[in-house]
Amino acid sequence: DPQQRKTVMDLVKDVCPERIYPVGRLDRNTTGVLLLTNDGDLASKLTHPKFLKKKVYHVHLDKNLTSHDMDQIREGITLDDGEIKADAIEYADDRDKSQVGIEIHSGKNRIVRRIFESLGYRVTKLDRVQFAGLTKKNLRRGDWRFLTEKEVDMLRMGAFE
């Protein structure tokens, strides 16, 4: 980090002797699932859009998302770098329309924030709850764990979405 701020790599710097690096990215203001690996082929398979690895986010907005805007996101919206549409989008809580769950497979930088910003919303909180079938279940913010052998095998076989 050019500003010498703590990064996720600081949390795992002494974990293993191999060089590890993040698969994809989360910006500073986003929490959630981030996979680290020393396997470049696996990283490529998980990040390239042609492999359609899904990412699911819980999004908090500064105001209620209208059903019209939700439909637009489903059908596709045009951003500076092309069209994007959600694979799925729903209200996270029917009583609070400012929270949505969105599933995408694009790896474009800040894509979730840019989708909502293009429609006049501000993302106040963004949490990636799933990546390629992996969740953060039972992990607190800042905690990490090694993948099980079964999870690694499933990722290598492409069995996770």
Can you annotate each of these PLM segments?
Residues 1-161:
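Basic, flexible Lys/Arg- and Gly-enriched helix-loop patches that mediate nucleic-acid binding at interfaces
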